[in-house]
Amino acid sequence: MNFELTEEMKMLKDMAYRFAVSEIKPVSQECDEHEKYLPEIRKKAAQNGLVGAWIPEQYGGSGAGILGNTIITEEISKIDMGISLNVVASGFGCESILNYGTEEQKKAYLPGICSGEKVCAGAYTEPNAGTDVAGYKTRAVKDGKDYIINGNKMFITNGTVCDFMVAQCITNPEEKKHNSFSLIIVPADAKGITRNKIHGKMGIRASDTAEIAFEDVRVPQTNLVGKEGQGFRQL
């Protein structure tokens, strides 16, 4: 079996590294030292097809797949891990939208990621549970045609710079844990959301990391990703 990269992937690898050297290296030290997030780098990367590369072309991506996205991540990270995350993780959380969302959700959220104009956050980790998905406590309770969300998320990548987030919430508390969670799209500017940037990280400081609090945050039930009660598996 031939494991060598195709010529197209080799070109992608070279282009990603050259982009990192020309656009990221000059500001790397400053961004790391001062915890600075530069959206213009993300937008320039998007113009070169480096953002949301794993997303199919029909939704605005370059269609490079997981392998192509991995190559981009490796090459940019050689220069700076933090700024690399700003580029390749700007769609973090959208994997669930692509895999389980409705066609309307895909068309509404994915193109903006690929163009570099929008940023998503995966609002999963919680203070009490870390990345133990079964231990999350954030609740989403139905009220009419909406969900009302209450809870806290911690160490959320893109937390203060995102335009929307995909949040893991308990929607079916009466079910066993693996059947109790759902993924819900939440606009970052929704009333009741508080976002606080986490300062003083030991590394990857150019990447935005935040604590997010939900207090009676109301979103329509149409923002449910996939099926209710399937969030544990989808994540």
Can you say where each PLM-predicted feature lies in the sequence?
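Short Ser/Thr-interspersed hydrophobic loop/turn segments at strand-loop and sheet-helix junctions
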Residues: 49, 72-77, 168-169, 186-191, ...
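A short, Trp-centered hydrophobic/proline-enriched beta-strand micro-motif
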Residues: 116-125, 168
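A glycine-rich, basic-preceded beta-loop-alpha segment at the flavin cofactor/substrate interface
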Residues: 67-68, 188-199, 208-235
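N-terminal glycine-rich flavin-associated loop
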Residues: 81-104, 130-133
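A short core secondary-structure module
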Residues: 146, 150-195
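A structural signal for short hydrophobic beta-strand segments in well-ordered beta-sheet cores
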Residues: 138-141
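Short Gly/Pro-enriched turn/cap motifs at secondary-structure boundaries
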Residues: 86-88, 128-131, 155-158, 174-175, ...
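Amphipathic, small/basic residue-rich leader segments at the start of a protein or domain
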Residues: 1-85, 108, 112-115, 119
